[in-house]
């Protein structure tokens, strides 16, 4: 079983991911979605957490061997990033969504040196907007952002476009395609449900029609 499949299985088992193609969720953007993900739940399950953190370490070593600092996005990327940095014996920092409005007014907490090669950790990629904002903030502070590694992606076309335009490499440990395949195999969804989930990936607005 691949790492992507193992993680998809774990996310379903611990209910970090819910699939309701016949009774969709409403995202903050207003989009009706057949999937809801809360990867913060993974921190409460040691087996799942270890699988994810070890997957992060292996992926970073394979794709970004020159990394010098790990950064987590606030807030979801912070615990994962801190664990990864500890496992890799690397410095750690975290990136706020906006400048702090008191004290030193930092957006990056921790010490990042000019030109230091950084990998940013995120838990979930939808459109990628927030983590790309974090990458831009890190670059402004002088970091050399090598790429972003995340637990899971919805594989939305908008995300691919955004990362391409930003020139930032994205790697995820698991993905929507893998998850719905595992969900069907393990009986979480019906054939009709799988059909709707595939339609959502193709067209997030008209998938129910």
Curated annotation (Swiss-Prot):
What keywords were assigned to this record?
Glycosyltransferase, Magnesium, Pyrimidine biosynthesis, Transferase
Any single biological process term in GO: pyrimidine nucleobase biosynthetic process
Kindly give the CDD domains that the UniProt entry links to this protein: PRTases_typeI
Concerning InterPro entries, the annotation shows: OPRT, Or_phspho_trans_dom, PRibTrfase_dom, PRTase-like
Q: What is its EC number?
A: 2.4.2.10
Q: Which residues does the annotation say bind 5-phospho-alpha-D-ribose 1-diphosphate?
A: 96, 100, 102, 122-130
Q: Which cofactor does it need?
A: Mg(2+)
Q: What does this protein do?
A: Catalyzes the transfer of a ribosyl phosphate group from 5-phosphoribose 1-diphosphate to orotate, leading to the formation of orotidine monophosphate (OMP).
| Self-association and partners | Homodimer.
Q: What protein name applies here?
A: Orotate phosphoribosyltransferase
């Amino acid at each position: 079983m691949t790492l992507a499949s193992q993680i998809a299985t774990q996310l379903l088992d611990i209910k970090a991911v819910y699939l309701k193609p016949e009774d969709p969720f409403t995202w903050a953007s207003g989009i009706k979605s057949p999937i809801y993900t809360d990867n913060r739940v993974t921190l409460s399950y040691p087996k799942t957490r270890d699988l994810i953190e070890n997957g992060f370490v292996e992926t970073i070593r394979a794709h970004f061997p020159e990394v010098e600092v790990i950064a987590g996005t606030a807030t979801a990327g912070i615990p994962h990033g801190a664990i990864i940095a500890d496992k890799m014996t690397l410095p750690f920092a975290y990136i706020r969504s906006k400048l702090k409005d008191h004290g030193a007014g930092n957006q990056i907490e921790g010490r990042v040196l000019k030109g230091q090669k950084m990998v940013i950790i995120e838990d979930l990629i939808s459109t990628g907007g927030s983590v790309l904002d974090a990458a831009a903030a890190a670059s402004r502070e002088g970091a050399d952002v090598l790429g972003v590694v995340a637990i899971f992606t919805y594989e939305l076309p908008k995300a691919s476009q955004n990362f391409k335009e930003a020139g930032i490499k994205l790697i995820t440990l698991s993905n929507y395609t893998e998850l719905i395949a595992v969900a069907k195999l393990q009986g979480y969804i019906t054939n009709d449900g799988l059909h709707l989930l595939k339609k959502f990936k193709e067209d997030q607005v008209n998938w129910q029609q």
